[in-house]
Amino acid sequence: MNNDFNSWDKYCNYLWFDKQVNIWLDISKINFTLDQISSLENKFKKVFSALKELEAGAISNIDEKRQVGHYWLRNPSVAPSNLIKDAINNEIRDISEFGEKILEGKITNNKNQKFTNVLWIGIGGSGLGPLLITEALQENSCGLNFSYIDNIDPFLISEKLDELSDKLATTLFVVVSKSGGTPEPKIAMNIIKKHVENKNLDWNSNAIAITMKDSQLYKKAQLENWLKIFNLPDWVGGRTSITSSVGLLPLALINRDVSEFIKGAAIMDDLTRIPNIKDNPAALLSSAWFFSGDGIGKRDMVVLPYRDRLQVFSKYLQQLVMESLGKKFNRKGEIVHQGISVFGNKGSTDQHAYVQQLRDGIDNFFCVFIELLDTPNSNFYFDSENPKEFLSGFLQGTRSALSNENRQSITITLDKLSCLTLGALIALFERAVSFYAELVDINAYDQPGVEAGKKAAAEIIDYQKQVTEIFNNGEELSIKEITSLLRNSSAEPIFFIIRQMCFGNDDYLINGDWSKPSTIRIKKIS
């Protein structure tokens, strides 16, 4: 490593720890010097100032002209108005009380049966956040059993409904959509609702909406008298919604401490308000990202949690980091193509997979190791073999092997996985994302690429409807002929539509060779 410290001195100088959350952060295996850290001090003055403005209620999502307030959720006292503060406190209290009543059987289905299961319908952060909560924190036989619909793959929907076939009557159906108009959860909800009603079961008394007030979903849930509606404010984005009702309701329904989760995030938020790089964990973490990628994101982030319960954390960070930081333009309107690609799974599994390339292949990444110090109540041994010690040995061995090849890494250590430490860990990465965005002068809170993808998908869906109507005329047509009948279309997406619609479908007569799309002619015969 090119730095002006020897390894031990650098480790001691830059190891961060806080006893409120018992989390350590080590960035010593990132290639930087003291002078480089010092060179960021002026930038960080602007970073700290920008975050203060954001928390005070500045319009930070310029595209949607809205505030960004997920930090208020864990400390309502910093919210810019008493109205918001009271709404947050009331929502937290409502969720906790609702969860208790569900688990105690004080709230039941329309046949007075206790709820046993949850089918959670949500995409992106609306699905990943709850999945992380339940995978990381649910204990055996505690609370309700969760299943997730985070896609409109028909096989996934069929599989989940089959799994719940004899439990549908006692399943809570939670639909999460801020606008209520996002196609995937809306389509999944309609399919599942129809399936439930076809079984002569009552959807409305089992259904919960998490949405923005007066959204399409809000109005539907209110009109149909659903069991419950929880608020998802317009100032909370999907990828930062885990400390809103989106993450707190799952906590309550698996009988975990909602207040401890919020407390962990609030403590970390406070720690990351310290206006000093070395004393601020988010400043250290974002600096490490900045130095490892030369400020232009030239290295990917490989997340390796050494605990199976945190396997989903890699996917969670993938959305949080990539959707926030993957931007074509900076705030000046200059093309910068910023971003950090994130992938990962878990240790020590990945030591038998892609760690080979990380050590000996292209040097285009930095690792984030996540270590835990606790053990189960029942210690598992075989002779003198302790799995915890082996897992720790694998982590340290991989970290050392990478370091010996000048491959960079960050190590985060938690004393245990709890509501408090998970809340703090999530908040640490949220704050680091905000800090990094300020360092490179991009907006972390818009997502023009996602919106462009949604718009393009909507156009294709419209073409699908038009193609279906064209075939109703009974003519035999080629791909080019179909394309010519559609405004502003091109042949390739039309071929994709035709293949999806017609291949293996006896309602259509296909002449031609599927390997030669220009020869294909299609006619609807029934």
Curated annotation (Swiss-Prot):
Its EC number is 5.3.1.9. One of its GO terms (cellular component) is cytosol. GO terms for molecular function: carbohydrate derivative binding; glucose-6-phosphate isomerase activity; monosaccharide binding. The keyword Isomerase applies. PROSITE patterns: P_GLUCOSE_ISOMERASE_2, P_GLUCOSE_ISOMERASE_3. It is an enzyme of class 5 (isomerase). Its main location: cytoplasm. Belongs to the GPI family. This is Glucose-6-phosphate isomerase. It comes from Prochlorococcus marinus subsp. pastoris (strain CCMP1986 / NIES-2087 / MED4).
